[in-house]
Regions:
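Structural/interface elements that position substrates and couple domains in central-metabolism enzymes
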Residues: 1-437
């Protein structure tokens, strides 16, 4: 099966590579020539465990190709996936200019029945705009070529995207025709041989499903952070509370870990877009609006705890472990670490940082305003306080007696609740975490 993927960002590159791994002939298209040139020599534009190996293998087998020219591949493909960016506008709405640009180019150049599938996260009603843009271009050409539009939202977790794509919980597809449904069934059949979990539905419902899923997960995170903050005030322990409610089969334990807030490319953007969709339709999403407010507040909690613990940070050296918004990625979009760094620098603190993967991304974003270190022990050397912002596995069991010797003072704020209070207090650290008094 011949497939084109427009956009070689996180969603597009992972999707295209996984389709190729299952035997499809895939061409990934991107307008960024530098990105395509790097992919041709095996350089990945993103970090995702296992992706580089998978890309190189499928390029070697001749199943995965890269180009800047969509027109050159349209004659041969049955399906075109649009996986371009939908950055938020100032009002929180999704900017569809790239999505509609793909639709117009599709309409200007198709010569036979082809399906344009939107993989990007887009507001409800986008498919209508995509279809209208294609039809307008066909009318300009004076041709009547059959086509379909479809919605196939992604549900990939950064750091586990390949596993998620190759063994999905479910695949959601919104279609308008039986013909499109048959093509999408054929495409996804190899991924779901034992249990065909493709859920076909109308397109608006598919578009809404993506936003609803991310909003639900974001809600659980903000809910638990709100509970954690109250636990601190009343003397409860959020870990016990989480266990008490997470074992209820109606609730479940996932996404109930208190911390310093969510970030990344999806939750913040999609929550804002869902709120904006409600406003556009005369409805206030009051729960979702609260989710966003709680998260914005929670991103500062590590800073707030630090200043309560040690007072004025001016002239103090603060070591920060973790920069990415979560482990196993270099993504720093909307990362809580950026909020804390900004507050510390404004207060006159000296900030040292370490992240196993996201150091280059941090330099790209904020430059040399912080000191970049080689490892967690180097980061802690000479520090007055140590902050944990990202729960990388390699941070879980540090050699604390070494850290105790190299730190100038002994303040620790655990923003992800992974360290042992008793052990650290026995070593003389002043330790605080989320959701405990």
């Amino acid at each position: 099966m011949n497939v084109a993927i427009v956009g070689t960002g996180y969603v597009g590159l992972v999707s295209g590579t996984c389709f190729a791994e299952m035997g499809a002939n895939v061409t990934c298209v991107d307008v960024d020539q530098k990105k395509i040139d790097k992919l041709h020599v095996g350089e990945m534009p993103i970090y995702e465990p296992g992706l580089e190996e998978l890309v190189k293998r499928n390029v070697g087998y001749g199943r995965l190709h890269f180009t800047t020219d969509l027109i050159s591949v349209l004659d041969d493909v049955e399906v075109v996936f649009s996986a371009v960016g939908t950055p938020p506008d100032e009002d929180g709405s999704a900017d569809l200019k790239y999505v509609l640009a793909v639709a117009r180019q599709f309409g200007q150049n198709i010569k036979k029945y082809t399906i344009l599938v939107t993989k990007s996260t887009v507001p409800v009603g986008t498919a209508k705009k995509v279809k209208a843009a294609i039809q307008e271009e066909l009318s300009k050409r004076g041709v009547d070529i059959p086509f379909d539009v479809a919605s196939n939202p992604e549900f990939l977790k950064e750091g586990a995207a390949i596993k998620d794509f190759m063994s999905p919980d479910r695949v959601v597809v919104g279609t308008e025709s039986k013909r499109a449904e048959e093509v999408m069934t054929k495409l996804y059949q190899p991924f779901l041989l034992q249990n065909f979990r493709v859920i076909f539905m109308d397109i608006p419902s598919a578009e809404m499903t993506k936003y609803a899923a991310n909003a639900m997960l974001a809600t659980r995170i903000s809910f638990m952070n709100d509970i954690a903050n109250l636990c601190e005030l009343v003397g409860a322990n959020v870990h016990n509370v989480r266990h008490g409610i997470g074992t209820d089969t109606r609730i479940g334990a996932k996404f109930l870990y208190a911390g310093c807030g969510y970030g990344g490319s999806c939750f913040p953007k999609d929550v804002k877009a869902l709120v904006h969709t409600g406003i556009e339709n005369g409805y206030h999403m009051e729960v979702i609006e609260a989710v966003e407010r709680v998260n914005d507040r929670q991103k500062s909690i590590v800073y707030d705890k630090l200043t309560r613990l040690m007072g004025d940070v001016k002239g103090k050296t603060i070591a920060m472990l973790g920069l990415a918004f979560k482990p196993d990625t270099d993504d720093m979009r909307e990362a809580p670490a950026l909020v804390v760094i900004d507050k510390l620098l404004k207060d006159g603190a000296i900030v040292r940082v370490f992240d196993p993967i996201a150091m280059l991304e941090c330099k790209r974003r904020i430059g040399e305003v912080v000191t970049y270190t080689e490892n967690l022990y180097d980061c802690a050397d000479g520090a007055d306080a140590l902050l944990l912002m990202t729960e990388w596995r390699q941070f879980r069991l540090p050699t604390w007696n070494v850290i105790q010797k190299v730190m100038t003072d002994k303040y620790i704020v655990d923003g992800r609740n992974i360290w042992n209070r008793a052990e650290l207090e026995e070593l003389g650290f002043s330790y605080t975490r989320i959701g405990e008094k």
